[in-house]
């Protein structure tokens, strides 16, 4: 998968944003296999049993947040994660806040700007930012 394909998939994802499938569509946009997504959706690979959370070992921790501050939520989650997730993501579907736990950098954007910030999640596609520079 190349960068232009990722950008194109992100544009489609945002145009037809579905809160129920957002995190799965995001992972698919970066080349995750449909079989992994299927197992994640049905709970086999989801390490979290809390509604609105998706936790995939070494990849991500995702949480829908509506009634609390996104910044406070991501800070609390980042200090408590247990499965070496690379990315912590929280969103209210207006704002997307993500932290790369390996590089210790944060993305804080309007969700509609996700395609412009495609490079943040490139490690999911096997590309580190240093490889692009």
What are these regions (language model features)?
Residues 1-133:
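Nucleic acid-processing catalytic cores of prokaryotic defense/repair systems
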């Amino acid at each position: 998968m190349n960068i232009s394909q990722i950008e194109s998939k992100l544009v489609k994802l945002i145009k037809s944003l579905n809160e129920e499938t957002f995190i799965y569509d995001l992972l698919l946009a970066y080349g995750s296999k449909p079989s992994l997504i299927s197992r994640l959706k049905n709970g086999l690979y989801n390490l979290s049993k809390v509604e609105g959370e998706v936790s995939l070992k070494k990849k991500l921790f995702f949480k829908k947040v509506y009634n609390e501050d996104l910044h406070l939520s991501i800070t609390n989650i980042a200090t408590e994660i247990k499965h070496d997730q690379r990315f912590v993501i929280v969103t209210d579907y207006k704002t997307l806040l993500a932290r790369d736990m390996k590089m210790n950098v944060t993305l804080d954007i309007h969700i509609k700007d996700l395609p412009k910030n495609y490079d943040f999640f490139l490690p999911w596609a096997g590309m580190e930012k240093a490889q692009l520079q």
